[in-house]
Structure formats: C-alpha cells, structure tokens
Amino acid sequence: MNSTTNSIDEWNAVAEQAMDLLKQLIATKSYSGQEHESALIIEKNLQSHGFEVERIQNNVLARGKHWVDGAPVLLLNSHHDTVRATSNWDTDPFEPVEMDGKLLGLGSNDAGAPLVCLLYIFYWLNERDQSFNLLFLASAEEEISGINGVPITLEAMGAVDLAVVGEPTSMELAVTERGLIVLDVTTLGESGHAARGEGVNALYKAVDAVQWLRSYEFQKVSERLGKVGMNVTQIEAGTQHNVVPDSCRFVVDVRPNDCYTNAEIVNIIREHIDGQVEPRSLHLNSSGIANHHPVVLKAKELGVSRVSSKTMSDQAQMPFPSVKIGPGDTHRSHTPNEFIYIYEILGGLMGYAQLLNGLEIPYWSPR
C-alpha cells in the first residue's frame, strides 16, 4: 500500500483485510443503541494501525495522522448499527457465511461493506499526500436516526467541508437525498352507541384525512428529488365493536424534497386536516450538493453515475455538504439473507480510491 497506485494483487490483499473485519462485525450483534461491542472492534482496528481514537458513546472517531491546521476537512463516515434480524433467515444472521461468491450476514450490505471499505481507504489516503485533512467516523444509531449517533459527534469533529457517507448505492454517487418527517395525527370525535348512530365518528374523520393525504400533490417538484411523498403507515381507533370511537390515531411517513423545509410541509398538512398533526422531529432534512462541486465533477470525469436517493442516511443530520456512495445494493438492505458480493468489496475500495485520492475540496465550514 505504499505505491501511488496499487497493483491488483495489493488491492486484493487490502480487500481480504476488509473482509476479515466485516466478518467480525457480522458476528457481533449491533442493534441500534447496542453497538458497544462493534464499536470496540472498530476502535481496536484503528489502534492497530496507529491511530488515536475518540469514543463518543458508541461512535468511533479518528483523525488523520498528518493534520494541517487550516486545511479543508474530508469526513469518511458510515454506520455500524443494524436493524433487528427477522425470523425468516435461512442462515444464522450473526454467522458470516461465504457461498456462491457472496458473504451473507446481518449488516453485510447495510452498511458493513461500505464501512470497512471506507476505513481501509482512510488508512490508504493517510499514506499519500493530500490537500485535505481526514476524519473517520463509525457512527451509531443511524437506523433509528438517533440522537446518540452523528448529532453528538459534531462538536468533537469541528469544521468539516465535505462528507462521504458510506451506504450501499452500487457505487453510484447519490448527490441528493430525501429527508424524513414522521407525523402522529389524531382526529377527535364524540363517543356514542353504534346501534343508535350516536356520536361523531373520529375514524370517519381520519378516513377523510387519509384520502386527502393519498391524493394531495405538493406544487413544487424538485428536478433531482421529484415530488414530496406521503404514506399512511399505521392506524388505530376504537375500543369495542359497539362504541363509536371518539379518537383515531394514525402515522404518516413523509419524504420531503429540497423545495420545502420540513416545517413548511407540516404547516401545509395542518391547513388541510381536521385533527392534531404532531411531527416527531423536524431536523431530518433533505440534502443535496451542488452540481459544480469538485467531488461531483470528478465522479462525472470517472464515469460514475450521479443519482438521487429515496432513502435517508446520516446525511440528514449533517450540516455540511455530503455525498452518499458505497458498495452493495440498497434493495438488499433490511431483508432476510442480506449479503454482499465479495467482488463488491474490491470494487468499493478501488472506487473510493479513484474518487478521493487527490481531490480538491473547497472550504465550506467557517474557520
């Protein structure tokens, strides 16, 4: 790894090391909020390569060895928490299994492979002269957009000018990403006896609201993210069959585009719904990076596809410019028998190296 450009044999050796780490992580349960053991594995790996590590709860942060005050800062980030395993796996989700050119295991694709590739590219970039400083962050609680993930690391990281977020994008560069608003909606009525048709049925009010949510289209359509998306995903009403319900509660999953703030979207919904509309949070915003940013231009030069992402990542909690890219396929995420193709590890390493080595990063954060 000491030459400017690695031979394929050298890259294969790096890929084997990354694979070994990925297998350790798969074998370690790391549900969101329970990432202590996986954080320890990543911490020890960094220390074995000579890096000082800062643990911020279950987040693992490391700085490059050749830090230059005042230089722009590149953050390499991916998450090491996973969703919970479902019961319909054909193999043990915590046992890394190689078969048919694949590595199976929970978190192998989302986001174990991007994580280990970014970590070993962090090592690789540290051995080469760059015009930027390097940060590496293995974050916790990404799958639940938790407050004990990226948000509690921002102060420790300081100024960041560009983040590369590792998620399974088939090594396409996601230049925009939808945000998320989860709404708890309650419609109110008056209880009464169902046989006598008494009361005001809150469930019927909810049906009217759901019909509006299903048919309404926000006027502003993003060139890159398209329309705002809304889906009702949960509903609950009533206590027994012969009582008209006096309240109905339902949940709405809203995926904003970059034409509206989250608060603007909530206000529009409130204007049209006869009920209480309460967002669980407003901070998971859409994100995007300018088409003329050097990382976007370099991706174009390399023939890397630039896409918009419908799924959300830790980008939503980052106040600085970011892109999302990594080995693996988003359609494999959160599925039984999750896997990564072994060749994707090698492709991820080489793809990251081509994109990031020698990149000129403009300042964004104030110094």
Model-inferred region functions:
Residues 74-76, 137, 164, 323-325:
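Hydrophobic/aromatic beta-strand patches that form the interior of the parallel beta-sheet core
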Residues 53, 96-98, 232-235:
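A structural signal for short hydrophobic beta-strand segments in well-ordered beta-sheet cores
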Residues 23, 43, 116-123, 151-154, ...:
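Predominant activation on well-ordered alpha-helical scaffold segments within soluble catalytic domains
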Residues 71-135, 342:
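Active-site metal-coordination/substrate-binding segment of hydrolases
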